[in-house]
Regions:
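Short hydrophobic/aromatic beta-strand immediately N-terminal to the Walker A/P-loop
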Residues: 2-4
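The Walker A (P-loop) glycine that initiates the GxxxxGKT/S ATP-binding motif of P-loop NTPases
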Residues: 7
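Walker A (P-loop) phosphate-binding loop of P-loop NTPases
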Residues: 10
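Conserved lysine of the Walker
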Residues: 13
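Hydrophobic positions on the alpha1 helix immediately C-terminal to the Walker A/P-loop
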Residues: 16
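ATP-dependent small-molecule kinase phosphotransfer cores
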Residues: 33-80
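ATP-dependent NMP and nucleoside kinases share a basic, alpha-helical "lid"
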Residues: 72-124
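Small-molecule kinase domains that catalyze NTP-dependent phosphoryl transfer to phosphate-bearing small molecules
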Residues: 125-179
Length: 181
């Protein structure tokens, strides 16, 4: 199975994907490892479709955030996996995932902006100067890319506001095991 987890910053994508990876025994690919800089959300989506989900030699160039350039090539295990990050779910990434012999599911997280901001700053206080710029890219991504996703693959939407991580994981796990496995 290939599970794509998307949502705005601070919505709980990394926590969810990490815990699902443990429960489902799947490798987790984090888009934070290959976004090409702070203006690279759309390019990150393209990297998933063109490189991470390739049927032969999948992988990506790890982004060197300190030097603002592409770094080493990171091979990705072919087959089942979880990919998480803002921009993970687009029509192109879903098409690329569907080429495989694996079932595909999408999980879209949302959350109240103040809660998400607080979570993101707690995780990485150096992110603060980039919050607005990244939020604009997310806004564009969700306006353009989130329409009709449920028509392409099973898609679960979860508003994480007021939920603890365990509740989010349980909903996602139940969805995956019902619709995908």
């Amino acid at each position: 199975m290939i599970v794509l987890v998307d949502g705005p910053s601070g919505s709980g994508k990394t926590t969810l994907a990490t815990r699902l990876g443990i429960l489902l025994r799947l490798p987790v690919i984090h888009m934070d490892d290959f976004y090409p800089g702070w203006s690279g959300l759309a390019a990150g989506s393209d990297i998933i479709a063109a490189s991470v989900l390739k049927t032969t030699d999948p992988g990506y160039y790890r982004w060197d955030w300190a030097n603002d350039r592409a770094g080493e090539w990171v091979p990705v295990p072919p087959g089942a996996k979880i990919i998480e990050g803002a921009g993970a779910v687009t029509a192109e990434t879903l098409r690329a995932a569907s080429i495989s012999d694996h079932q595909v599911a999408a999980i879209m997280l949302t959350g109240e902006a103040t809660t998400r901001y607080r979570r993101a700053m707690r995780r990485d206080p150096y992110y603060e100067p980039y919050w607005e710029m990244w939020a604009e890219q997310e806004k564009h991504h969700y306006a353009v890319q989130s329409q009709g996703l449920g028509d392409l693959v099973p898609t679960l939407w979860i508003d994480t506001t007021g939920l603890d991580a365990g509740q989010v994981v349980r909903r996602a796990y139940d969805f995956i095991t019902y619709y995908v496995e």
